[in-house]
Amino acid sequence: HKEYRRQRQMCIRDRKDKTCCFSGHRNLGKYDYNYVYQRTKDIITLLAENGIVYFGTGGAIGFDTIAAKAVLAVREIYPQIKLILVLPCEDQARYWKAENVEEYNKIKEQADKIRYVSKSYYDGCIHKKNRHMVDCSSICVCFLTDFESGTAVTVDYAIEKGLDVINVADEFDDVL
């Protein structure tokens, strides 16, 4: 825990103003995948053009995967940006379907940095991962449609900590 705290303090001091985190649902509901992906990519592009360098995502199925893929696409145009995977545990994908594991591993291979909150899963490791990402960021890009969810808890924490929050599910003109 001591090393984790030291790293956390270091990231807050050194990179917070250049860092964006992502939080979102695993299920997109009525939203079209390509629509969410394109909007996320557009927001990342705007952030990259305005000095955001580090983009942290939790690597889960759903919006985390969309965000990671969007960062990788934007990185082709803005090579200075970095994809940071902040994963709750090393065995996160243990019970996933094969196609999800394959996509997850491809993203891990292309990430600039991978940080694990814990070696193995325990109650609370996802919550700890979410708080770590918020604590190290100045902006939170989210996909929030269910206000009684873990994503809502993370976004509320981001607001409490003073982060700018951009919800991909909001009207695009209102966001930018």
Residue ranges with predicted function:
Residues R13-L176:
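Acidic/glycine-enriched connector segments
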